[in-house]
Amino acid sequence: ETVGADSLLQRVLFQLTPFNRDIIIVTAGSKSLPQLDGYQGARVVTDIYPGKGVLGGIYTGLAESSSSYNLVVAGDMPFLNQALLRYMVGLSAGFDLVVPRLGDMVEPLHAVYARNCLAHIKRLLERGVLEVRALFELVKVRYVEASEIDRFDPGHLSFFNVNTEADLERARQIAMRYVKR
């Protein structure tokens, strides 16, 4: 699926490339992703814990990374905001997890995870606990509140993700109206 001239994944990669050339894409199975052409630092890895949902994917990405701190985002978020991501990375020292919180809702797939989370995530997965929020009780978390997010992304478009055809159509309309790329 494309939004503007790019696929959803290309839009995500474009926003992440300035942060690190080593971009890890976790997939449920071995997939060929032709939209990765031109992104030499992007590599595709297969989920170590298939069927374990988001938490398994986060574990796999962290296990494959050599970085102490890692931006973890969903591949279907076409409107990531680099300034907000940069702000979150800047907050990460001294925390295991930096995650946006809008009221009662947190965005675990738009967060900075320390590799220190690996052992905690592994224990959760081995116990069959798949809820990402369970990790929040085990690690030092810095919540990025709405008032902070609003300074960079007042429309909260960073958290828009494409799950349905209607979402895809809405993303295309947003891209035509508001977003340069």
Regions found by a protein language model. Name each.
Residues 136, 164:
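A residue-level signal for conserved active-site and pocket-lining positions in enzyme catalytic cores
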Residues 1-129, 137-156, 169, 173-179:
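Nucleotide and nucleotide-moiety/phosphate-recognizing core
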